Swiss-Prot record:
Motif DEAD box in this chain: 537-540
GO BP, sorted A to Z: mRNA processing; RNA splicing
Keywords: ATP-binding, Cytoplasm, Helicase, Hydrolase, mRNA processing, mRNA splicing, Nucleotide-binding, Nucleus
Chain intervals with Gly residues compositional bias: 806-817
Gene coding for it: prp28
InterPro entries for the chain: DEAD/DEAH_box_helicase_dom, Helicase_ATP-bd, Helicase_C-like, P-loop_NTPase, RNA-helicase_DEAD-box_CS, RNA_helicase_DEAD_Q_motif
Subcellular location: Cytoplasm; Nucleus
Protein name, per record: Pre-mRNA-splicing ATP-dependent RNA helicase prp28
Length: 817
């Protein structure tokens, strides 16, 4: 209380130094009940005592006066009077209205409030530390004086001496910040050691220490200039941060503590030099000769035009010519900037402005990878494809607005007369990718007449199944018929007489299965004397079905006079596009497949010359638009019940395809589906060609809801808008499974594939789990993830493959496998 009283009086008016010289130290303060304030300074007259005769002042005089730098205290302070009820209610109403109004704080105000709050926290922490330090000093003084067992006088004298020594050290460690008139009094009062002095107060240096602490905190938090900031940063760098000072920086990028990678890169946000050095805050701009920021060439066109206009006004003849040169230079600069700009997407650039980086991004966007020499860049749209105008018109009439990924990459390569191997997933648009270059190729050959029509077709397309061959025929007629070309399909199931009648007028393009085409060649129904374009679609499937020998016979029957050389000339587009001896051109061979088994590689190495390899996506992976679901359902009855639940849910619209493994089961499942109330047809190898075509036609037209088929329909069959594929029995290998689920999700549309698994499917569980893991929209069920057969790849079947390949060449002893 005494220290507070003296500090208040000292804050109001400092006492004159002449009155304090030579006086003994002030006596200790009296108790609170007998407290008498010190007499007022002589320079100010005390206010008159309040008279009881005068009436109380009106409420307007009781309002607080404007803020003054210092308030009178003690006897000079005005005596507060009672407030009226109206004033209290008025103040309360004004306070409520002020509190209800939203108060906007600027950034500087928010920073000021944060600094004040931080200063108060630091002051409170420092006050606590000083209190603890004083407490330790007092305890140490008592213990050092005989553990407190000495006399009271000795204990008090020892306490006073220890306090004076500690106080002297503390005052000497701080720089005086108070008024000059009060320094001597404090020093004399602290340095006096007379026997008649009483004990000092418990915290005599609190005000000085607190004042010094506030000043230091304010100096640390808000330095006066940039030099103090830089000095503080250097001090922190070499001496370390203070104990209670946060080292968090909002600008510095934070890294996770669990991250093990070492970061070798430097981020611009980690530069803290602009915080303390103002030279880094303002970027220096180049000032060159001439008007404008860059010597007459400003970044905006308006400044350039203004400069050119000023030149023209100054000198109409020479200045006008110079102005036109400046405008032309600015235009060229903008064109160069647009050509070399990295911020534009490849779709916004012109073809001549595309750089190597843009083509890499383009290929990554469409998941295109190419291999081979002298491969041209892909096409971004149909207008850049270099196709003839009449063919482009047909493409737009058919409704092909944007090319697919395989069409973007394969068509420019095929137009250069290069041999090609295309590896793409099912439903990716491969048919148009090889049909369009084929039509361009044969359009440069002379049309067939009465003499040349007997020499055979210009091109043949091989397909593994009848359905796929007929599907390619339908697609080819869309483009070939408007151009005046004839397409004929030769497949099994139809009589040779009927197909011979279709070939009576000749045909430029023949689509055939390998077995039936070999029969036609051996029976002299067809010759390949002028065939110079060969396409093998689903080549891996043809090998799986045992057509390898038939394919070799067909390729050996081709003429050798126009075969490409196995040299670097095979990669030269101009050399391969030349005509040989008038009408003949070099033979061009293309192969499309979903996988690349060794037998397919062997055929490609024998008959293709320096082929370019185009891969869309990853080999053997499913289409990304198909959601794969796997359910463990054991037993035929439970699977039929689950199939009924799926069909009756109404989640999937027809058509729906259900795959089984054996023909007998195919008819049984179709019969059960009819009992469920849905129309169904079957498709398997025992059906005649007419029955197959009728079944596919009913599904495509919408007359039938469900198609139940074996793996015969798993390759190349295009039924539009299939929403669901159900694998009633899991396929025997992962390749067949991939082609099964590829019947849905075609042409960029989404689809769902549901597979019923059992313990009998352990050979394919590992590959199935890997395929589900790679899919971004599919989920691996826990039962499959933890299954023993899914932990490692099955070794079953490799021994059987060795038996087939050894000794009998796949016949005789190995045929039973």
């Amino acid at each position: 209380m005494a220290s507070n009283g003296y500090s208040n009086s000292a804050d109001a008016v400092p006492p004159p130094p002449s009155d304090n010289d030579g006086r003994p130290p002030s006596p200790p303060p009296p108790p609170p009940d007998s407290f008498v304030p010190p007499p007022p300074p002589s320079s100010l007259a005390p206010p008159p005592p309040p008279s009881s005769d005068l009436p109380p002042p009106p409420p307007s005089e009781l309002l607080p006066p404007p803020p003054e730098p210092k308030k009178k205290k003690g006897w000079g302070a005005p005596k507060p009077g009672p407030l009226s009820i109206e004033d209290i209610l008025k103040k309360k109403k004004e306070a409520d209205e002020a509190a209800a109004k939203p108060k906007f704080l600027s950034k500087a105000a928010r920073e000021k409030l944060a600094l004040e709050k931080r200063a108060k926290e630091v002051e409170e922490q420092k006050r606590k530390r000083e209190a603890e330090q004083d407490n330790r000093i007092s305890i140490g003084s008592v213990n050092g004086n005989g553990n407190g067992y000495g006399s009271a006088a000795n204990g008090r004298d020892g306490y006073e001496r220890s306090y004076q020594q500690e106080n002297g050290r503390r005052e000497s460690s701080f720089v005086p910040t108070g008024p000059r008139a009060m320094r001597n009094s404090q020093q004399s009062r602290s340095s006096s050691d007379k026997p008649n002095d009483m004990e000092p107060p418990p915290k005599p240096a609190k005000s000085a220490a607190a004042g010094t602490g506030k000043a230091s905190v304010a100096g640390e938090k808000r330095p006066a200039n940039a030099e103090d900031l830089q000095a503080a940063l250097i001090k922190t760098r070499y001496m370390g941060a203070e104990t209670n000072q946060s080292t968090f920086s909002a600008k510095k990028k934070r890294r996770r503590t669990t991250e093990k990678k070492f970061n070798f890169e430097w981020n611009a946000e980690e530069d803290t030099s602009p915080d303390y050095n103002p030279i880094y805050q303002n970027r220096a701009e180049a000032g060159l000769y001439g008007r404008g920021r860059l010597g007459g060439f400003a970044e905006d066109e308006g400044a350039t035009l203004k400069y050119a206009k000023a030149l023209e006004e100054r000198d109409a003849e020479a200045g006008g010519a110079r102005a036109r040169e400046i405008v032309e230079m600015e235009r060229r600069r903008k064109e160069d900037a647009g050509r070399n700009s990295l911020d534009k997407h490849w779709s916004e650039k012109k073809l001549e402005h595309m750089r190597e980086r843009d083509w890499r991004i383009f290929k990554e966007d469409f998941n295109i990878s190419t291999k081979g020499g002298a491969i041209p860049n892909p096409m971004r749209n149909w207008s850049e494809s270099k196709l003839p105008k009449r063919l482009l018109d047909v493409i737009h009439q058919v409704g092909y607005d944007e090319p697919s990924a395989v069409q973007r990459a394969a068509i420019p390569i095929a137009l250069q007369a290069r041999d090609l191997i295309g590896v793409a997933v099912t439903g990716s648009g491969k048919t148009a990718a090889f049909l369009l270059p084929l039509l361009v190729y044969i359009s440069e050959l002379p049309p067939l007449n009465e003499f040349t029509k007997n020499d055979g077709p210009y091109a043949i397309i091989l397909a593994p199944t009848r359905e796929l061959a007929q599907q390619i025929e339908v697609e080819a007629k869309k483009f070939a018929t408007p151009l005046g070309f004839t397409c004929v399909s030769i497949v099994g199931g139809h009589s040779l007489e009927e197909q011979s009648y279709n070939l009576r007028n000749g045909a430029e393009i023949i689509i055939a299965t390998p077995g039936r085409l070999v029969d036609c060649i051996e029976r002299r129904v067809l010759v390949l004397g002028q065939c110079c374009y060969i396409i093998m679609d689903e080549a891996d499937r043809m090998i799986d079905l045992g057509f390898e020998e038939s394919v070799n016979k067909i390729l050996d029957a081709l003429p050798v006079s126009n075969e490409k050389p196995d040299t670097d000339d095979a990669e030269d587009a101009q050399a391969m596009s030349r005509h040989l001896g008038g009408k003949d051109r070099y033979r061009q061979t293309m192969m499309y497949t979903a996988t690349m088994p060794p037998a397919v590689e062997k055929i490609a190495k024998k008959y293709l010359r320096r082929p370019a390899i185009v891969t869309i996506g990853n080999i053997g992976e499913a289409v990304e638009t198909v959601e794969q679901r796997v359910e463990f359902v054991a037993g035929e009855d439970k699977r039929k019940k689950r199939l009924n639940e799926i069909l009756a849910s109404g989640e999937f619209a027809p058509p729906i395809i259900v795959f089984v493994n054996i023909k007998r089961n195919c008819d049984a499942v179709a019969r059960d589906i009819k009992h469920m109330g849905f129309t169904s047809v079957t498709l398997h190898g025992s059906k005649t060609q007419e029955q197959r075509e009728a079944a596919l036609a009913s599904v495509r037209s919408g007359a039938t809801n469900v198609l139940v088929a074996t793996d015969l329909a798993g390759r190349g069959i295009d039924v539009p808008d299939v929403s669901l594929v159900v694998n009633f029995n899991m396929a025997t290998n992962i390749e067949s499974y991939t082609h099964r689920i590829g019947r849905t999700g075609r042409a960029g549309k989404s689809g769902v594939a549901i597979t019923f698994l059992g313990n009998e499917d352990s050979d394919t569980m590992y590959d199935l789990k890997q395929m589900l893991t790679k899919s971004s929209i599919s989920r691996v069920p826990e039962e499959l993830r933890k299954h023993e057969a899914a932990q490692q790849k099955s070794q079953r079947g490799q021994g059987m493959k060795k038996i087939e390949e050894g000794g009998f060449g796949g016949k005789g002893g190995g045929g039973g496998w």
